[in-house]
């Protein structure tokens, strides 16, 4: 299914499943969240089938007895459910404009205020053997208006971009 929502009548089941995921899946055993089910509940956006969820039968299963590939799929589905209903990821974004010799230079940086659902996603990514390359969040040094920067080195570099390769049947 491509649906990312559940129906209103599934709210209690979703809460129960989230609790089971946090208890049964070793990867999420230390995770404690207060789920916001309302973010994934919308009858009008459910197409022919609701979003994929683990069932309450997970509670009766020995997850360690599952093949590794099935455990990975279950962890992925559990992670998506916890992220979708977890706390918001909030950050403060700062923009700095510097002027030098009549030229203006701008940069942006972010500071995480509350990691929220990103903590669950990072936990999942750290469990994978091949880690995805993620854009590291740029943190900026403490600067104030009017500060003078001495001995700043700079260089000019030339880079070329290429479009992503098109999908083929090969």
Whereabouts are the PLM-identified features?
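Core catalytic DNA strand-manipulation module of type IA topoisomerases
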Residues: 1-170
């Amino acid at each position: 299914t491509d649906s990312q929502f559940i129906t209103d009548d599934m709210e209690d089941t979703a809460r129960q499943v989230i609790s089971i995921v946090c208890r049964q899946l070793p990867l999420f055993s230390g995770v404690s969240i207060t789920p916001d089910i309302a973010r994934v509940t919308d009858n009008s956006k459910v197409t022919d089938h609701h979003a994929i969820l683990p069932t309450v039968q997970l509670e009766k299963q020995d997850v360690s007895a599952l093949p590794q590939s099935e455990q990975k799929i279950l962890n992925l589905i559990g992670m998506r459910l916890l992220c979708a209903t977890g706390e918001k990821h909030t950050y403060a974004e700062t923009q700095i404009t510097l002027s030098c010799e009549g030229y203006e230079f701008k940069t942006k940086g972010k500071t995480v205020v509350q990691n929220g659902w990103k903590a669950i996603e990072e936990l999942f990514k750290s469990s994978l053997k091949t880690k995805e390359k993620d854009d590291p969040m740029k943190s900026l040094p403490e600067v104030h208006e009017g500060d003078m920067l001495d001995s700043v080195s700079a260089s000019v570099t030339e880079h070329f971009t290429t479009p992503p390769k098109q999908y083929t049947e090969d």
